[in-house]
Amino acid sequence: MVRVSPSSPSARPGVTPDGAAPDTGALPTVSPVPADDPRGLALGFTAYFVWGLLPLYMAMLAPAGALEIVVVRIGFALIFCLVLLGLMRRLGELGTALATPGRWGTTGLAAGIIAVNWLLYAVSVTTGNVLQASLGYFMNPLVNVLLGVLFLGERLRRGQWVAVGIAVAAVVVMSAAMGQVPWIALGLATSFGLYGFVKKRFPSPVHAVTAMTAETVVLIPVFVVGSVLLAQAGLLTTVTEGPGHFWLMAGLGVLTAVPLILFSAAARSLTLTTLGMLQYTAPILQFLVAVTVLGEQMPAARWAGFGLIWLSLAVFTVDQLNASRLQRRAVRAGQGAHA
């Protein structure tokens, strides 16, 4: 989620933890719904549940490497989205989006950033570093805060400074424990934050699926060149490991688009506070999958690092809730004064 302060452009939830942002336009600073719709809550939780279990699915794609996973994901996501747009009768909208010269720069930038994010995510799975992916997405709200400071000139509240300071301490502890900087976690958090920043700073007027399709169209050269290089090196396992493996790889297209659709539907019927809470579902599930299923180790120093991140997020969340409550109170007071 992209949040700095309740009223800032970068403070509005709307980015998914698998690197796809629903283009719903500018969201209001105060939720338009008085309460959360149970159906929307179910849809939102399902979307984050799928994203949280994605590392488990990717682990089943062995012996495919990280580069092949990304290349094939681009290809099958494009196919699935084109079929979906056809069923939705929005193919014309895609043509309009691609024919708008002013959108090419933003679409290309977003596509490039999300390709890097997908690659780092795949690397985290294929190298046994899913815990770093979890750490990266836990850190994402804090990275969004820093992006607001760097690019929007926003000022942090005291609670936000405390949260960022604790997060920095967590990175230091994790670096000492690992003997190196957790570059996968930092790369995921940064690329994901930048992607969300671009999507919210330059919102697209088209449907979320249309926007995602346009981005995958831009990535077609990556798909073509990557497929050729992998085939020449004998590493294109999608077509050499049998039909079962092929369809598992094809499933990446479905898992890219379907959760996005669920999230987009949920975002229209949930408060921003609820969306902000739901975003932690994915990294929590990634953490549990890494430790209990994939067998990644959690020595004491790593527990300390994650503990500091969780403490930082607790401080951050309390600060956000307090700020949101004060804003709603101010809005009600203003409405009462003009009644």
Predicted segments with their positions:
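C-terminal-most transmembrane helix of multi-pass membrane proteins
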Residues: V2-P6, I74, A176, V181, ...
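Hydrophobic alpha-helical transmembrane segments of multi-pass membrane transport proteins
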Residues: F45, F49-L53, Y57, G108-T127, ...
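Juxtamembrane helix-loop-helix junctions in multi-pass membrane proteins
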Residues: G52-L78, Q132, L194-L219
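Membrane-interface helix termini and inter-helical loops of multi-pass transporters
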Residues: L56-A66, E93-G95, T126-N129, V171-V172, ...
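Hydrophobic transmembrane alpha-helices of multi-pass small-molecule transport proteins
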Residues: C81, G159-S175, L186-F192, A301-Q320
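Helix-helix packing/entry segments at the starts of transmembrane helices
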Residues: L135-M139, P203-V218, A257-T292
